[in-house]
């Protein structure tokens, strides 16, 4: 499973890259606004850092506007993926952009049928929001299972990006189900490293090491 970072914070991206586990980045208008920096300045820096896919979102509600914005975003870098909302107008934009070779990521997906529509429209990626669905139903991961089954049944090439990830269990369950990608906040990625027994074991090893005579280092 690929690990994407859901952020527009360049420092977080740099740290994740140092760990050697970052495969891509997803952003949205909210994450961009939190940086307090000009849009193009932030995006340019991210695209220079990251080799993998970087999702950038359109803000228009009509297909014509999404297509126009999508083309502009695609010009910023070869690895740009255009995020499009799961609406009828959005699917029109997906068809147009994908026909031009511009990859799309259909976002704000909350049902298997929405994901099916996105795949039939030819979207490169689909982003089901598990955390937000858990908030109202507790069935976020069931959604991923159902989408994966549908895509497998009909051999769609659309990749599943598990989004709205709240905690490490979402990451674990995504991997167990076999999702293609999990995009997560930096704090969740950090938590994946942690286990109390790891800390206890390391502390014990270091204490025992101090007892070793004539240590080489």
UniProtKB/Swiss-Prot annotation:
Main location: cytoplasm
Top-level EC class: transferase
GO cellular-component term (any): cytoplasm
GO molecular function, one term: aldehyde-lyase activity
EC number: 2.2.1.2
Localisation per UniProt entry: Cytoplasm
InterPro entries: Aldolase_TIM (IPR013785), TAL/FSA (IPR001585), Transaldolase_3B (IPR022999), Transaldolase_3B/F6P_aldolase (IPR004731), Transaldolase_AS (IPR018225), TSA/FSA_arc/bac (IPR033919)
Catalytic reaction list: D-sedoheptulose 7-phosphate + D-glyceraldehyde 3-phosphate = D-erythrose 4-phosphate + beta-D-fructose 6-phosphate
Active site: 83 (schiff-base intermediate with substrate)
Matching CDD domains: Transaldolase_FSA
Disulfide bonds: none
PROSITE patterns in alphabetical order: TRANSALDOLASE_1
Gene Ontology biological process terms from the UniProt entry: carbohydrate metabolic process; pentose-phosphate shunt
Pfam family, one: TAL_FSA
Family: Belongs to the transaldolase family. Type 3B subfamily.
Function recorded in the entry: Transaldolase is important for the balance of metabolites in the pentose-phosphate pathway.
Designated name of the protein: Probable transaldolase
């Amino acid at each position: 499973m690929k690990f994407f970072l859901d952020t527009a914070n360049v420092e977080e991206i740099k740290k994740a890259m140092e760990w050697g586990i970052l495969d891509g980045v997803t952003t949205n208008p909210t994450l961009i606004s939190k940086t307090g920096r000009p849009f193009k300045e932030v995006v340019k820096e991210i695209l220079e850092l990251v080799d993998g896919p970087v999702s950038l979102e359109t803000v228009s509600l009509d297909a014509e506007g999404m297509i126009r914005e999508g083309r502009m975003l695609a010009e910023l870098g070869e690895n740009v993926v255009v995020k499009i909302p799961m609406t009828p107008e959005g699917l029109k934009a997906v068809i147009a952009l994908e026909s031009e070779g511009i990859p799309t990521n259909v976002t704000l997906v909350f049902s298997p049928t929405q994901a099916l529509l996105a795949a039939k429209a030819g979207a490169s990626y689909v982003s089901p929001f598990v955390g937000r669905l858990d908030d109202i139903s507790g069935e976020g991961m069931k959604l991923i299972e159902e989408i994966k089954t549908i895509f497998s049944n009909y051999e769609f090439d659309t990749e599943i990006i598990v989004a709205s990830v709240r905690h490490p269990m979402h990451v674990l369950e995504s991997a167990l189900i076999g999702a293609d990608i999990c995009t997560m906040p930096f704090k969740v990625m950090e938590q994946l490293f942690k286990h109390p027994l790891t800390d206890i074991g390391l502390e014990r090893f270091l204490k025992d090491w101090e007892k070793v005579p004539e240590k080489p280092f």
